[in-house]
Amino acid sequence: MPRRIALIDLVGLSPALIGPHTPAIAAFAREKGGVRTMRPTLPAVTTSVQTSMLTGVGPAEHGIVGNGWMDPASGEVALWKQSDGLVQAERLWDTARHRDPDVTCANICWWYAMHTSCDTVVTPRPIYKADGRKIPDCLTEPADLRDRLTRALGPFPLFRFWGPAADITSTRWIADAAIKVERDTTPTITLVYLPHLDYGLQKLGPDHPEIPQHLRELDHEVARLLEHFTSRGVEPILVSEYGIVPVTDAVAPNRILRDAGLLYWREEQGREMVDPGTSGAFAVADHQVAHVRLGRGGLARRDEIAALFASTAGVAQVLQGEERAAAGLDHPRAGDLVLVSDRDRWFTHDWWHDDAKMPDFQRTVDIHRKPGYDPRELFVDPAIRFPKLAIGSRLIRRKLGFRTLLDVIATDPTLVRGSHGRIDQGLGWDGVLVADAAANLDDEADGRVPCTAVRDLALGTMFG
């Protein structure tokens, strides 16, 4: 019978942050022989690195080239899709079943949790009402688990999971759910995703004086999980996908493409709307990486576009051809050009020059409509003098049945103080691996362990 394991993802935790404010994590690391620094696959973003850890291969093979991409068939950009069918490589639990068909897996909020071969699933899934309301909820497998979790823990705290109010509440709910699911189902593999650090580090930056409190809050939840799992004979493995570094400003590649006459946009009732599929080129911005897809009008201008970005302040690399392949992104979903920002920059999806003409959804939390990742959704616009009153009045209008936008989100990219996505942030600022056998893993030349080694480490822990 395989040894049971729990793979716990402490998003945003880097070796530089482990210390006096994380006593439980630090003690566990000492017990396991120390903290190993992990080298992420490019891009170092949630869905890509999680999938690399679970499959043992990089994006060129598993196909998850970012948190989203432009579909060449539809010409549409889609981020944060959840179907397991998007992953094009076998994942940990299915690989383990080749050795023991009785292996079971519980996925508590890791990505691509829908339509999956996992036995138990808990994943955020809001209810979207026709009148524009977004109701906090989760999707589970089996279906009745949702009702049991809601009765025991309350509804999934969606607005504490992402947005200006994000805090430890969502991480605590996930930890509670993981404990309940493990106790009730005793899975062979338990995956747990704890997002708390991710938001504070992006919002405040890793050097902010409030970060020690965020670390203590996370450490408390990790301590509960470690105590639970070890008492149940489950071997914990701590990982994080990436570390988060300080940033000062953003680069807007779609504005550059627009100024070069390559972006297709039109004015709709005073708002400038873009059509990525019709554009000669469009950049899908994803933290510190942007995938630039070239359309009919852009393919013939590839070298010109590459040179344009290479000369842009804040852009560190423009990958194409053999360089793109060497970076592990030789996949049809990846951009024809892949941009990597400077260490202190990130990419926005913005294409408008006049904020009065931005899309109406830009000042809302709308992760599916925006054709790029937008960490400004963590901020209420500081220009709003009475933010609680502004939000409350809009919520009252919604409750009265009026279709009302919660258009209170900031648009200033300089508010964002932390980002990730690059794979060479500097030692101390990458992801971590803490596990029994981690000390025996082979290093790369820079002393880091590739994140793709996690799958085989997990299998080795299970089967010896």
Q: Could you tell me what each predicted segment is?
A:
Residues 16-61, 104-106:
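Short, structured active-site-proximal loop/turn typified by the sulfatase FGly-forming signature C/S-X-P-X-R
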